[in-house]
């Protein structure tokens, strides 16, 4: 687990991401670290750059989690984004409920992959999510964020090494580039 904390800490503290405002938010949140995503067919603008918008179905967890109050669409605060909504935040976990069975004991090991044309990543970190349904007592949320965008709000080039907890074969897994 220390290796996971160290890796995530290194990613969060690297490069341009250092200028962001990371805070611990203690509230319900969507944990998208082990989710895949699919295109909505729309675009989303981050720091003046248009990206393809992706949607990920993510389990809602409780407790302290890290958010970037200057990133995503958090607008400076951990305050709830609205009625029926939560933020997509990050909390290291060995097990994360995942589609299709949403079993809370599903292992979610860290893995890396290299992006390729048409096989990138999605960034849901610190974007708002809409609560949907419960499956096997796990509350789910639809989270919307950009494809191939870094934590610092810049494009991810093809050939970038990425870390994720999504299973091998996941479409546009939620993750972040390694420095």
Feature map (PLM): residue ranges:
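Bacterial N-terminal signal peptides that target proteins for export
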Residues: 1-8
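Mitochondrial intermembrane space
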Residues: 20-179
